[in-house]
Design a protein with these regions (language model features):
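C-terminal nucleotide
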Residues: 1-118, 129-168
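Glycine-rich active-site/cofactor-binding loop and its immediate structural neighborhood
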Residues: 125
Length: 168
């Protein structure tokens, strides 16, 4: 999705292929059980953008093209490192984007075998997307039994919620 300066939006479809399926099977979506107001988190950095913070955002935006290249070339394991890089840049935007619970969870995921991940949306809580191969997941969940894993699949038609019955 490209957001143009004139307010228009251009959507470029990514063909469903085996690379996308490989990516899907290596992603975990974890609910952090931390509720927050996205508007409050986003306003903590959007309204106070310095030159250096604008550079972080510009770098994050370039990751979209890098992600597309990864999907085209099939080097799917590089996606974890890309998520990690995006997360490190995003955390530099505001101290409200992460907290000790999120940092502990993320570090536990890395120590368990994840190659990267990032908090989705504005930050501060919500959902953590991790790139973790199946062989590392047992170790991850053994030490984190209270984590809520949200199963998901990519869809050609956009976001859909079939049924949601998780509780924090």
């Amino acid at each position: 999705i490209k957001f143009n300066k004139n307010g228009s939006i251009k959507v470029k479809k990514i063909k469903q292929n085996n690379n996308l399926k490989k990516l899907e099977k290596n992603l975990l979506l974890i609910y952090t059980s931390i509720n927050r107001t996205a508007h409050e988190i986003a306003s903590s950095y959007v309204n106070k953008l310095t030159k250096s913070k604008k550079k972080y955002i510009e770098s994050i935006i370039t990751h979209v093209n890098e992600g597309e290249k990864i999907l085209k070339t099939g080097n799917i394991d590089d996606f974890g490192e890309l998520l990690h890089s995006s997360w490190m840049l995003k955390k530099k935007l505001s101290s409200a984007i992460s907290n000790s619970k999120i940092d502990d969870l993320y570090n536990h995921a890395l120590l368990s075998g994840a190659s990267g991940g990032k908090l989705l949306g504005a930050g501060g809580g919500g959902f953590l997307l991790l790139y973790m191969k199946k062989k590392y997941r047992k170790k991850f969940f053994l030490k984190s039994k209270k984590l809520i894993n949200i199963p998901f699949k990519f869809s050609n038609i956009g976001s859909e919620v079939i049924y949601n019955n998780f509780q924090s």
